[in-house]
C-alpha cells in the first residue's frame, strides 16, 4: 500500500514539498449529483426560482470554489488554475442534477482537489438556493473520474466503478 504523503517520518502533518518536481500539464475530472423532489427540479429547470438562476449561480460558485481550494483544505498547495469547465446537467428521469467539473493547470501538483471542491461547492449552492422548497435533497456520489499528468500519469475510473483501490 502506498504511503500517505501528508505525514512526515515523525507522523506529523506537513505540506508536501513539490519544489523539485517539474511543471507539467495536469487535468482532473470530478462528478457528483444532487437528488431532489421532481417538483424542485422542475422549478430549477423552468428558471422560476425567486432567488434567480440556480444553475448559473451554482456554476459560478463552483468555479470560485476551485480557485479557493487551498484556502479550504489546509495542506493543499495554492496553484495557478488555467481552466475550469463546470457543467450542470438536469436528469429528470432520476430527479437529480449531475455536476461534472474539469480543472486544468500547468504546475508541480495535480488539480484533483480543485475539481472535487468545485463539484461540491456547486452542489452545495444548489442545496442552499433550494432548501426552502426541498430540505430532503441529497448530495451523492462525489468522486474523481480521471486525472492526467504528473508522476502517476493517467488514471481513469473504470466504467460503473463506485470505488477505486488504485492510484
Swiss-Prot record:
Family classification: Belongs to the MoaC family.
Enzyme Commission designation: 4.6.1.17
Annotated active site: 128
Record organism: Methylococcus capsulatus (strain ATCC 33009 / NCIMB 11132 / Bath)
Function: Catalyzes the conversion of (8S)-3',8-cyclo-7,8-dihydroguanosine 5'-triphosphate to cyclic pyranopterin monophosphate (cPMP).
SUBUNIT field: Homohexamer; trimer of dimers.
Class of the enzyme per the UniProt entry, highest EC level: lyase
GO biological process assignments: Mo-molybdopterin cofactor biosynthetic process
PANTHER family: MOLYBDOPTERIN COFACTOR SYNTHESIS PROTEIN A (PTHR22960)
Protein name per the record: Cyclic pyranopterin monophosphate synthase
UniProt: substrate binding residues: 75-77, 113-114
Reactions catalysed: (8S)-3',8-cyclo-7,8-dihydroguanosine 5'-triphosphate = cyclic pyranopterin phosphate + diphosphate
Metabolic or biological pathway, per its Swiss-Prot or TrEMBL entry: Cofactor biosynthesis; molybdopterin biosynthesis
Pfam families associated with the record: MoaC
Keywords: Lyase, Molybdenum cofactor biosynthesis
SUPFAM superfamilies documented for this protein: Molybdenum cofactor biosynthesis protein C, MoaC
GO molecular function: cyclic pyranopterin monophosphate synthase activity
Disulphide bond pairs: none
Superkingdom as given in the UniProt entry: Bacteria
